[in-house]
Protein backbone atom coordinates (compact mmCIF):
# COMPACT_ATOMS: atom_id res chain seq x y z
CA UNK A 1 0.00 0.00 0.00
CA UNK A 2 0.91 3.65 0.04
CA UNK A 3 2.33 3.41 3.55
CA UNK A 4 4.63 0.52 2.72
CA UNK A 5 8.00 0.36 1.06
CA UNK A 6 9.32 -2.34 -1.26
CA UNK A 7 12.94 -3.27 -1.91
CA UNK A 8 13.46 -5.52 -4.92
CA UNK A 9 16.71 -7.42 -5.39
CA UNK A 10 17.98 -9.09 -8.55
CA UNK A 11 21.38 -10.43 -9.50
CA UNK A 12 21.29 -8.98 -13.02
CA UNK A 13 21.66 -5.30 -13.81
CA UNK A 14 19.29 -5.69 -16.78
CA UNK A 15 16.42 -6.82 -14.54
CA UNK A 16 17.13 -4.08 -11.99
CA UNK A 17 17.07 -1.51 -14.82
CA UNK A 18 13.78 -2.89 -16.18
CA UNK A 19 12.23 -2.88 -12.71
CA UNK A 20 13.31 0.72 -12.13
CA UNK A 21 11.88 1.76 -15.50
CA UNK A 22 8.58 0.04 -14.72
CA UNK A 23 8.42 1.74 -11.32
CA UNK A 24 8.93 5.13 -12.98
CA UNK A 25 6.33 4.32 -15.63
CA UNK A 26 3.85 3.30 -12.94
CA UNK A 27 4.77 6.34 -10.83
CA UNK A 28 5.60 4.17 -7.81
CA UNK A 29 7.63 6.17 -5.35
CA UNK A 30 7.75 3.65 -2.52
CA UNK A 31 9.92 1.09 -4.29
CA UNK A 32 13.62 0.71 -4.94
CA UNK A 33 15.62 -1.96 -6.71
CA UNK A 34 19.08 -3.14 -5.76
CA UNK A 35 21.64 -5.28 -7.49
CA UNK A 36 22.56 -8.27 -5.34
CA UNK A 37 22.44 -11.99 -4.79
CA UNK A 38 19.92 -13.90 -2.75
CA UNK A 39 22.74 -15.43 -0.68
CA UNK A 40 24.03 -11.94 0.27
CA UNK A 41 21.09 -9.53 0.28
CA UNK A 42 22.00 -5.83 0.15
CA UNK A 43 19.52 -5.09 2.94
CA UNK A 44 20.19 -4.14 6.57
CA UNK A 45 19.56 -6.52 9.45
CA UNK A 46 15.93 -6.67 10.61
CA UNK A 47 14.82 -4.16 7.96
CA UNK A 48 12.01 -6.15 6.28
CA UNK A 49 8.52 -7.11 7.38
CA UNK A 50 8.18 -9.66 4.58
CA UNK A 51 10.57 -11.49 2.26
CA UNK A 52 8.98 -12.80 -0.94
CA UNK A 53 10.63 -15.07 -3.50
CA UNK A 54 9.20 -16.58 -6.67
CA UNK A 55 11.06 -19.50 -8.28
CA UNK A 56 14.56 -18.29 -7.38
CA UNK A 57 15.74 -20.35 -4.42
CA UNK A 58 16.00 -23.50 -6.56
CA UNK A 59 18.66 -21.76 -8.60
CA UNK A 60 20.89 -21.12 -5.58
CA UNK A 61 23.84 -23.43 -4.97
CA UNK A 62 23.64 -22.58 -1.23
CA UNK A 63 20.03 -22.80 -0.10
CA UNK A 64 20.85 -22.84 3.65
CA UNK A 65 22.57 -19.46 3.17
CA UNK A 66 19.48 -18.13 1.38
CA UNK A 67 17.35 -18.94 4.42
CA UNK A 68 19.93 -17.47 6.81
CA UNK A 69 19.90 -14.25 4.80
CA UNK A 70 16.11 -14.07 4.74
CA UNK A 71 16.12 -14.59 8.51
CA UNK A 72 18.76 -11.87 8.96
CA UNK A 73 16.88 -9.19 7.03
CA UNK A 74 13.48 -9.93 8.59
CA UNK A 75 12.40 -8.11 11.72
CA UNK A 76 11.18 -10.21 14.67
CA UNK A 77 7.74 -11.50 13.70
CA UNK A 78 8.52 -11.02 9.99
CA UNK A 79 7.20 -13.45 7.42
CA UNK A 80 8.82 -15.43 4.62
CA UNK A 81 6.61 -16.24 1.59
CA UNK A 82 7.94 -18.33 -1.28
CA UNK A 83 6.58 -19.97 -4.39
CA UNK A 84 9.01 -22.51 -5.79
CA UNK A 85 9.39 -26.04 -7.04
CA UNK A 86 10.02 -28.71 -4.41
CA UNK A 87 10.94 -32.38 -4.68
CA UNK A 88 8.36 -34.83 -3.37
CA UNK A 89 10.87 -37.65 -3.82
CA UNK A 90 14.54 -37.73 -4.79
CA UNK A 91 14.88 -37.23 -8.57
CA UNK A 92 17.33 -39.54 -10.34
CA UNK A 93 20.88 -38.25 -10.75
CA UNK A 94 20.49 -37.61 -14.48
CA UNK A 95 17.62 -35.20 -13.72
CA UNK A 96 19.49 -33.52 -10.86
CA UNK A 97 22.47 -32.86 -13.17
CA UNK A 98 20.51 -31.82 -16.27
CA UNK A 99 21.30 -28.15 -17.01
CA UNK A 100 17.96 -27.61 -18.77
CA UNK A 101 16.01 -28.98 -15.80
CA UNK A 102 18.13 -26.98 -13.35
CA UNK A 103 17.49 -23.77 -15.31
CA UNK A 104 13.80 -24.71 -15.34
CA UNK A 105 13.79 -24.95 -11.53
CA UNK A 106 13.25 -28.71 -11.56
CA UNK A 107 16.67 -30.35 -11.47
CA UNK A 108 17.87 -28.57 -8.35
CA UNK A 109 14.64 -28.88 -6.35
CA UNK A 110 15.15 -29.78 -2.69
CA UNK A 111 13.15 -32.39 -0.84
CA UNK A 112 10.40 -30.94 1.33
CA UNK A 113 11.97 -32.43 4.46
CA UNK A 114 15.35 -30.89 3.56
CA UNK A 115 13.77 -27.46 3.03
CA UNK A 116 12.05 -27.68 6.41
CA UNK A 117 15.36 -28.60 8.06
CA UNK A 118 17.20 -25.70 6.35
CA UNK A 119 14.54 -23.22 7.41
CA UNK A 120 14.47 -24.51 10.99
CA UNK A 121 18.28 -24.37 11.15
CA UNK A 122 18.12 -20.72 10.05
CA UNK A 123 15.77 -20.02 12.97
CA UNK A 124 12.35 -19.95 11.31
CA UNK A 125 9.19 -21.21 13.00
CA UNK A 126 5.63 -21.88 11.84
CA UNK A 127 7.04 -23.46 8.69
CA UNK A 128 4.43 -24.54 6.18
CA UNK A 129 5.20 -26.12 2.82
CA UNK A 130 2.09 -26.76 0.76
CA UNK A 131 2.58 -28.72 -2.48
CA UNK A 132 0.18 -27.75 -5.25
CA UNK A 133 -0.85 -30.91 -7.11
CA UNK A 134 -2.59 -28.79 -9.74
CA UNK A 135 0.86 -27.52 -10.78
CA UNK A 136 1.79 -30.91 -12.22
CA UNK A 137 -0.08 -30.19 -15.46
CA UNK A 138 2.01 -27.14 -16.34
CA UNK A 139 5.25 -28.56 -14.93
CA UNK A 140 4.91 -31.54 -17.27
CA UNK A 141 4.89 -29.07 -20.18
CA UNK A 142 8.32 -27.77 -19.07
CA UNK A 143 9.96 -31.12 -19.84
CA UNK A 144 7.66 -33.32 -21.93
CA UNK A 145 8.36 -37.03 -21.70
CA UNK A 146 10.75 -36.70 -18.74
CA UNK A 147 8.24 -37.70 -16.01
CA UNK A 148 9.41 -34.78 -13.87
CA UNK A 149 6.08 -34.67 -12.07
CA UNK A 150 6.94 -38.02 -10.49
CA UNK A 151 9.51 -36.05 -8.47
CA UNK A 152 8.67 -32.33 -8.35
CA UNK A 153 5.70 -30.05 -7.76
CA UNK A 154 5.18 -26.33 -7.21
CA UNK A 155 4.61 -25.32 -3.59
CA UNK A 156 3.89 -22.34 -1.42
CA UNK A 157 6.35 -22.06 1.43
CA UNK A 158 5.76 -19.91 4.48
CA UNK A 159 7.62 -19.28 7.72
CA UNK A 160 7.92 -16.72 10.50
CA UNK A 161 10.90 -15.23 12.30
CA UNK A 162 10.03 -15.65 15.99
CA UNK A 163 8.84 -12.52 17.80
CA UNK A 164 11.13 -13.33 20.71
CA UNK A 165 14.08 -13.35 18.33
CA UNK A 166 16.38 -10.38 18.58
CA UNK A 167 19.19 -9.59 16.20
CA UNK A 168 21.48 -6.61 15.84
CA UNK A 169 18.87 -4.49 14.06
CA UNK A 170 15.92 -5.23 16.40
CA UNK A 171 15.21 -2.62 19.05
What spans do the regions from the language model cover?
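Class I S-adenosylmethionine-dependent transferase superfamily signal
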Residues: 55, 69-71, 119
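A short SAM/SAH-binding and catalytic strip from SAM-dependent methyltransferases
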Residues: 49-62
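Class I SAM-dependent methyltransferase SAM/SAH-binding core
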Residues: 1-41, 65
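Short, glycine-/aromatic-enriched active-site segment of Class I SAM-dependent methyltransferases
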Residues: 86-106
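Helix-to-beta-strand junctions that scaffold the AdoMet/dcAdoMet cofactor pocket
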Residues: 1, 59-61, 74-76
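C-terminal lobe and adjacent flexible extensions of AdoMet/dcAdoMet transferase-like proteins
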Residues: 118-171
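A short acidic, Gly/Pro-enriched loop at the edge of an enzyme's catalytic core
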Residues: 39-50
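A short glycine-rich, Lys/Arg-flanked "PGG" loop and its adjoining helix->strand segment in the class I
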Residues: 64-79
Amino acid sequence: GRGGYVIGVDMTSDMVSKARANALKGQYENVEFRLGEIEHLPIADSAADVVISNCVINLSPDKPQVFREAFRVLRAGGRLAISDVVATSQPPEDMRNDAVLIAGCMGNASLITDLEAMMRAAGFEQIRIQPKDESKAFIEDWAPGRNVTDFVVSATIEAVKPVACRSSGDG
